[in-house]
Design a protein with these regions (language model features):
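Short acidic (Asp/Glu) and glycine-rich catalytic loops that position anionic groups and cofactors
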Residues: 21-22, 64-65, 131-140
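Extended redox/cofactor-interaction regions of prokaryotic respiratory oxidoreductases
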Residues: 1-107, 117-124, 191
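Catalytic, metal-anchored helix/loop core of enzyme active sites in primary metabolism
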Residues: 110
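N-terminal leader/propeptide and maturation segments of large enzyme subunits in energy/redox metabolism
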Residues: 69, 141-191
């Protein structure tokens, strides 16, 4: 899915400034709040905006969050304080879940966008660890079922609505990105 192969996809590139196209904002600290927060502390940002925490060797001021998009992840499954999640969830104005399973996150979301499974899209995956790593091509087996769309198309459409489609796609379609990431992997493997 979107963001899986490398760090460029962790945040929408059209908003994060991880491309050569100028971002909506410079991705530095915004109004004194940190531009990044540890995922395990996102509930703290919702419930205690402005709180300063120590993270990764530095002080981080948690930003106020009004909206969250969860793509292919289920915080209800991985977070240790479910009641605190529910409390924070109620404070958000909008929650969007993008997933191919009907998870707890989907059940609590305001909007659910159905994503394709690994059988319904072309993708790349990583295998191995440390000195024995590689990437493999995963070819689409069946067309997307019902209203499911692949992550790339979902995020491209979201970026289009914010006039950031070109920044997100960098002029490439889904297969163009897969080929580019594959070639980057081939070059790294030669290193």
């Amino acid at each position: 899915g979107a963001g899986t192969p490398g760090r460029k996809g962790v945040i929408l590139s059209g908003f994060s400034g991880s491309t050569s196209i100028p971002p909506v904002h410079d991705n530095s600290d915004y109004k004194g709040y940190s531009s990044t927060i540890p995922i395990a502390r996102f509930i703290d940002a919702i419930l205690e905006p402005g709180k300063v925490i120590n993270w990764n060797g530095k002080s981080v001021k948690l930003p106020p969050l009004k909206m969250c998009i969860f793509a292919g992840t289920n915080p209800f499954h991985r977070h240790q304080q479910i009641n605190r999640i529910i409390e924070g969830w109620r404070k958000l104005e909008t929650v969007i879940a993008i997933d191919n399973q009907w998870t707890s996150t989907c059940r609590f979301a305001d909007i659910v966008l159905p994503a394709t499974t690994q059988f319904e899209r072309n993708d790349l995956d990583q295998y191995g660890n440390h000195s024995n790593r590689g990437i493999i091509a995963m070819k689409q087996v069946v067309p997307p079922q019902f209203e499911a769309r692949n992550d790339f198309d979902i995020f491209r459409e979201l970026c289009r609505r914010f006039n950031r489609e070109e920044a997100f796609t960098e002029g490439l379609d889904e297969m163009g990105w897969l080929k580019r990431i594959w070639q980057e992997g081939v070059q790294q493997g030669k290193g």
